[in-house]
Amino acid sequence: MDTAEERLKGQAEIWEHMFAFVDSMALKCAVELGIPDIINSHGRPVTISEIVDSLKTNTPSSSPNIDYLTRIMRLLVHKRLFTSELHQESNQLLYNLTRSSKWLLKDSKFNLSPLVLWETNPILLKPWQYLGKCAQEKSSPFERAHGCEIWDLALADPKFNNFLNGAMQCSTTTIINEMLLEYKDGFSGIAGSLVDVGGGTGSIIAEIVKAHPHIQGINFDLPHVVATAAEFPGVKHVGGDMFVDIPEADAVIMKWILHDWSDEDCTIILKNCYRAIRKKKNGKVIIVDCVLRPDGNDLFDKMGLIFDVLMMAHTTAGKERTEAEWKILLNNAGFPRYNVIRTPAFPCIIEAFPE
């Protein structure tokens, strides 16, 4: 029988889960107001009054609510996004950055702010209201919420398309360093060309080519996506459809692409990858994606489980996969040999080789 203490712990855990969205909204508030940047610009811990003064300077017409800001900062300090320390002389709290909030600085190369604003945007939040219904009826929460798939919305709405591209580019910068380090020999061994399938605006292939100038980079995505891409040295932008044809290359790379699609769709994409590299002596496909370990305790194992449910809300049939599921998927598409390379960052690198 549960003790009174156990029952209270259980109750507290449900309360915490129930209101977990408050953490996300407080985080969004801090990003929207640029609070990490305000603290960073001072070069020292700041008071709430100094934060308010900076907000007034940035937006002269604003009238910041100091009570709200103080309470929001109190929660974010508790969540370790900021620190606070009482200044003895002034008897005011001084706020400073932590290792977490340093990832929210807009001028930093490693800035997760666009992704925070993406995931907390009403368009992305609305599908979650349909998760239970869709679990009963086997339908798509995003289509229920918006009447179309996320890719169709991006095609129809240029503003949303740019928003999506910015978030995806942001996700790239968080992992590129670890990827270049952990797969250095793999990139060095590519004889000539590398096509980034679903490469968005080309930021990841640009970084790979910059680190390995012998590689001829091809950024491949839908025409309306590459139309907004900047020019990068050694990178050619190509518009097309990965479900129809993929440009020939010595190797193919896909970052967080296959988790957006069903096994059937992934098989089509992978077979097109097979055709793209089949004439090459050492052709291979490099998949940067999650490899689920449901019982794992590493830094990002829990995030894999979260992303798996995230795919339900954002895509029609996307999902994260265990190594056993990857093995079946790759084998069915003509890739019987593969290696899983775990990195310190969230996704793994899967090297797949044709027969």
UniProtKB/Swiss-Prot annotation:
GO MF assignments: (R,S)-reticuline 7-O-methyltransferase activity; identical protein binding; O-methyltransferase activity; protein dimerization activity
Enzyme Commission (EC) number: 2.1.1.291
The organism's place on the tree of life at top rank: Eukaryota
Expressed in which tissues: Expressed in capsules, buds and stems, and at lower levels in leaves. Localized to parenchyma cells within the vascular bundle, but only to those cells distal to laticifers. In roots, found in the pericycle within the stele.
Primary enzyme class: transferase
Keywords for the protein's UniProt record, in alphabetical order: Alkaloid metabolism, Methyltransferase, S-adenosyl-L-methionine, Transferase
Keyword Methyltransferase annotated: yes
Catalytic activity: (S)-reticuline + S-adenosyl-L-methionine = (S)-laudanine + S-adenosyl-L-homocysteine + H(+); (R)-reticuline + S-adenosyl-L-methionine = (R)-laudanine + S-adenosyl-L-homocysteine + H(+)
Residue ranges of coiled coil: none
Functional pH dependence: Optimum pH is 8.0.
Pfam families listed in its UniProt record: Dimerisation, Methyltransf_2
Gene Ontology biological-process entries: alkaloid biosynthetic process; methylation
Statement: the UniProt record of this protein carries the keyword tRNA-binding: no
Thermal activity characteristics from the UniProt entry: Optimum temperature is 37 degrees Celsius.
Self-association and partners: Homodimer.
Functional summary from the UniProt entry: Catalyzes the transfer of a methyl group to reticuline to form laudanine. Methylates the simple catechols guaiacol and isovanillic acid as well as the tetrahydrobenzylisoquinolines (R)-reticuline, (S)-reticuline, (R,S)-orientaline, (R)-protosinomenine and (R,S)-isoorientaline. Involved in the production of laudanine.
Family listed: Belongs to the class I-like SAM-binding methyltransferase superfamily. Cation-independent O-methyltransferase family.
UniProt name for this protein: (R,S)-reticuline 7-O-methyltransferase
Annotated source species: Papaver somniferum
Annotated gene: 7OMT
